[in-house]
Every structure is written in structure tokens, then in C-alpha cells.
């Protein structure tokens, strides 16, 4: 076994492509992945943050904020997903009575 650390995720296929990143604390940003390291620190260009609802911080609004070039610290990254090729579906585990 070599002494070189490898990343948990292989993000090489997402470099120069759009990604969505969810961070601890509920922040959510999208942008073009420009780089990353073995600690999952991410560099995003043309980043846009989705502003959360003041009444319900778990929901995002249609309002966005342009951030430009940012670094997402790896310890704060909860989820990384491509923006292309994904679609939102209804939650099959939520019943009409629970809503």
C-alpha cells in the first residue's frame, strides 16, 4: 500500500462540469468544478448560492446570490452531484396524510 492518500470520491469526471454542492448548515451552491483535493476541498467557478427561506431554513427559495469563484472546505461538504442528468422526483415515502 502506498503512502499517497486518495480521495473517497473520484471527482475527475466532473472537472469543468456543473455540480451542485450541499454544505453543513444547509447552504446549497452550484457552479463549475475547477479543482479538488484529497480532503474534498472544492474550487467552484461561477458559483451561485440558493437563498434559504427565512421562515423555514430547510427550504430554498427561487432567489439566488452570485458568488463567483469560491472554495468549499471539505469538512463542510455533505453532497456533491452533477447538475446535468438529474431530475427531481416526488418523495415516494411521504403520504398524503403526513403532509
Swiss-Prot record:
Molecular function as annotated in GO: RNA binding
Localization: Cytoplasm; Nucleus
Domain Sm: 6-86
InterPro entries named in the record: Lsm7, Lsm7/SmG-like, LSM_dom_sf, Sm, Sm_dom_euk/arc
GO biological process terms on file: deadenylation-dependent decapping of nuclear-transcribed mRNA; mRNA splicing, via spliceosome
Tissue: Expressed in roots, leaves, stems, flowers and siliques.
Family annotation (Gene3D superfamilies): 2.30.30.100
Pfam families: LSM
Keywords carried by this UniProt record: Cytoplasm, mRNA processing, mRNA splicing, Nucleus, Ribonucleoprotein, RNA-binding, Spliceosome
Any one GO cellular component localisation term in the record: P-body
Xref: SUPFAM superfamilies: Sm-like ribonucleoproteins
Keyword RNA-binding (UniProt): yes
Family: Belongs to the snRNP Sm proteins family.
Purpose of the protein: Component of LSM protein complexes, which are involved in RNA processing. Component of the cytoplasmic LSM1-LSM7 complex which is involved in mRNA degradation by promoting decapping and leading to accurate 5'-3' mRNA decay. The cytoplasmic LSM1-LSM7 complex regulates developmental gene expression by the decapping of specific development-related transcripts. Component of the nuclear LSM2-LSM8 complex which is involved splicing nuclear mRNAs.
Subunit structure: Component of the heptameric LSM1-LSM7 complex that forms a seven-membered ring structure with a donut shape. The LSM subunits are arranged in the order LSM1, LSM2, LSM3, LSM6, LSM5, LSM7 and LSM4. Component of the heptameric LSM2-LSM8 complex that forms a seven-membered ring structure with a donut shape. The LSM subunits are arranged in the order LSM8, LSM2, LSM3, LSM6, LSM5, LSM7 and LSM4. LSM7 subunit interacts only with its two neighboring subunits, LSM5 and LSM4.
Protein's name in the database: Sm-like protein LSM7
Biological classification of the source: Eukaryota, Viridiplantae, Streptophyta, Embryophyta, Tracheophyta
Encoding gene, per UniProt annotation: LSM7
